[in-house]
């Protein structure tokens, strides 16, 4: 497998085996406790798409007012795609672009939502956990599909949820965010508790399946239209 090693992965030899080993090591740094302000001012959503037949990784960042959930900033970062998709190693493919997008924000978010897994991952170190450990920012993973673990299908109403278990331990939540839609896979990434990940995701839901931070980032990453910014943010 041909890879271009980003400085954020210093010490990685580019192999799948060592990438998995690094995940297991870095997973020990994940903090599953709530370290988010009770009244955060800024949230951010991140998602990734691809251009040029997959040769370019396109990372979208959207900064939102935490009270109104209206967007304040949007940015897109583009970097050459460094490696092919390997299940469970998404961060080694997408994290360099996400960090570039984060650097474009004029203000630092208090809490970050990533389109992808937090600790709901075979080695409990998905892209939201990796992002959080590298940046130090509280993070939550919100994925559209399950990667690891099992769960009982939650009820059909908005807000219904059930725990996702792996080897007898909870790694996330299956959350029915919208009736007649498949559940989201929600899990803490870093500096957020299991319950906190669920609560914050519920707080940021509106009329759509995805919470506003990742919904807007998904829209920007997939080039489905411009996002109108809130020009006068609410002061908390």
UniProtKB/Swiss-Prot annotation:
Residues annotated as binding Mg(2+): 47, 115
Molecular functions (GO terms): deoxyribonuclease V activity; magnesium ion binding; RNA endonuclease activity, producing 5'-phosphomonoesters; single-stranded RNA binding
Organism annotation: Xanthomonas campestris pv. campestris (strain ATCC 33913 / DSM 3586 / NCPPB 528 / LMG 568 / P 25)
Cofactor(s) this protein requires: Mg(2+)
GO BP of this protein: DNA repair
Alphabetized InterPro entries for the sequence: Endonuclease-V
Role noted for this protein: DNA repair enzyme involved in the repair of deaminated bases. Selectively cleaves double-stranded DNA at the second phosphodiester bond 3' to a deoxyinosine leaving behind the intact lesion on the nicked DNA.
Family under the similarity heading: Belongs to the endonuclease V family.
Claim: Signal is one of the keywords in the record: no
UniProt keyword terms in alphabetical order: Cytoplasm, DNA damage, DNA repair, Endonuclease, Hydrolase, Magnesium, Metal-binding, Nuclease
Official protein name in the record: Endonuclease V
Cellular-component GO terms for this entry: cytoplasm
Pfam families assigned: Endonuclease_5
């Amino acid at each position: 497998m041909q890879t271009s090693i980003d400085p954020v992965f210093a010490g990685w030899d580019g192999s799948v085996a060592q990438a998995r080993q690094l995940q297991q090591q870095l997973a020990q740094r994940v903090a599953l406790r709530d370290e988010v302000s009770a009244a955060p001012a800024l949230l951010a959503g991140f998602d990734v798409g691809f251009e040029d037949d997959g040769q370019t990784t396109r990372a979208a960042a959207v900064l939102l007012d935490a009270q109104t959930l209206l967007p304040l900033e949007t940015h897109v970062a583009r970097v050459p795609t460094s490696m092919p998709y390997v299940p469970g190693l998404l961060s080694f493919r997408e994290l360099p672009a996400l960090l570039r997008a984060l650097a474009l924000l004029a203000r630092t978010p208090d809490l970050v939502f990533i389109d992808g897994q937090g600790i709901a991952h075979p080695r409990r170190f998905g892209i939201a956990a990796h992002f959080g450990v590298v940046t130090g920012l509280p993070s939550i993973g919100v994925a559209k599909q399950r990667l690891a673990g099992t769960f009982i299908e939650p009820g059909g109403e908005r807000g219904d949820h059930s725990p996702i278990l792996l080897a007898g331990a909870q790694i996330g939540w299956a959350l029915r965010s919208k009736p007649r839609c498949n559940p989201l896979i929600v899990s803490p990434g870093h500096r957020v508790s299991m319950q906190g990940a669920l609560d914050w995701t519920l707080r940021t839901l509106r009329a759509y399946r995805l919470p506003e931070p990742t919904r807007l980032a998904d829209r920007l990453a997939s080039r489905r239209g411009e996002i109108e910014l809130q020009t006068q943010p609410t002061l908390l």
